[in-house]
Amino acid sequence: FMNWRLYWMFSGGNVTENMIHQIAWIMSALDLPLPSAAYMSGGIFSEKDGREVPDTMSVTLDFPETVVTWQSTFNNRRYGLGQKLLGSDGTIEYVAGATDMVKGESEEQIHYYPEKVNRPNGVAITGNSPTHNHMQNWIDCMRSRKTPNAPTELGYRSAVAAHMANLSYRQKRRVTLEEAKAFQPEY
């Protein structure tokens, strides 16, 4: 079945397909625990193809000392893929370009832009993404028994955040971690 991703029975939509990976980067950088609450709003505004999962969404994840937001839409590619970590000392931006289908590589870069108010002498930096060789890191860690760049615990926390977001969307309300733990699906 080609478009299984469009239906709740088979998929969590773009939240479990993409947000889970993008949120992992932020959760890792900030060493965040499980979110205490999640809220997701959105709808089917662009892709009128019979899908059940939203094509446009905005997710807010509450953590003890910060809030993380994630947005996605299928009807505008102006800003491409990427994440921005906005802090009082500056912004770290992870930019993912299109994958070269011949080389199997994507143009990924990380940029740091200092916040001039708090870091007047800060210097902007551009570097390569540490996830560029993500699969190679995973294979190397199987051989060496070292911890991979994206350990299992990080995947778990990211998955919980994604499922909380979808639960919020489907219930049309903010969902706490405790409510998500107690949730029993009807199927």
Walk through the language-model features, giving the residues of each:
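Contiguous beta-strand/loop segments that form the cofactor/metal-binding neighborhood of enzyme cores
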Residues: 1-12, 16-153, 159-187
